[in-house]
Swiss-Prot record:
Pfam families, A to Z: Pribosyltran (PF00156)
Keyword hit for NADP: no
Name the record gives this protein: Adenine phosphoribosyltransferase
GN (gene name): apt
HAMAP family xref list: Aden_phosphoribosyltr
Record-linked SUPFAM superfamilies: PRTase-like
Lineage: Bacteria, Pseudomonadati, Pseudomonadota, Alphaproteobacteria, Hyphomicrobiales
Annotated EC: 2.4.2.7
Reaction(s) catalysed (UniProt annotation): AMP + diphosphate = 5-phospho-alpha-D-ribose 1-diphosphate + adenine
UniProt xrefs under InterPro entries: Ade_phspho_trans, PRibTrfase_dom, PRTase-like, UPRTase/APRTase
């Protein structure tokens, strides 16, 4: 990468203690995204393994996955597919329900966003328990996508999300791990 790079990706991520509740260390990736050098490096590192390969679409999970996914799609000359919370898309959608800590939520995508057999990279800023990413991956698979990889800037490995995606047979790429979260 750039020889003058001074800040590590991990250093570019702000930690906010006790947010949103006591005992939680919130990893705020928006500080990395606001640092041009760090953001470029993160995007470049996530793109690198797939550059030169056929990637048809990048699917980003609402909301920070849109920011990251758009940049990655641009670099890969691929289309971008938003995966959104229920009720946010205007046309015919495919939907999947998934469990949260205290209930159930749903996410959706346009039915015509993916053609069967298209090669897709799934993107979000962070993987923790993996529930949202797992649901997004299952939705893409239901739509006929071939998921090339799931990519995240941050991994909270103690919460097991990576293992959920790997259990689906998906390669997972992360750039920074915060152990003990």
């Amino acid at each position: 990468m750039e020889s003058g790079f001074k800040v590590t990706l991990k250093d570019a991520i702000r930690t906010i203690p006790d947010y949103p509740k006591p005992g939680v260390q919130f990893r705020d990736v928006t500080t990395l995204m606001g640092n041009a050098q760090a953001f470029r490096r993160a995007v470049d590192e996530l793109v690198y393994p797939y550059a030169g390969n056929r990637i048809d679409k990048v699917a980003g999970i609402e909301a920070r996955g849109f920011i990251l996914g758009g940049a990655i799609a641009h670099q890969l000359s691929a289309g971008f597919v938003p995966i959104r919370k229920k009720g946010k898309l205007p046309r015919d959608t495919a939907r999947i329900a998934y469990s949260l800590e205290y209930g159930v939520d749903e996410m959706e995508m346009h039915r015509d966003a993916i053609e069967k057999g298209e090669r897709v990279v799934l993107v979000d800023d962070l993987i923790a328990t993996g529930g949202t990413a797992e649901a997004a991956a299952k939705l893409l698979l239901q739509m006929g996508a071939e998921i090339v990889a799931a990519c995240f800037i941050i991994d909270l490995p103690d919460l097991g999300g990576r293992k959920k995606l790997e259990a689906l047979g998906l390669p997972v790429r992360t750039l920074v791990a915060f152990e003990g979260d």
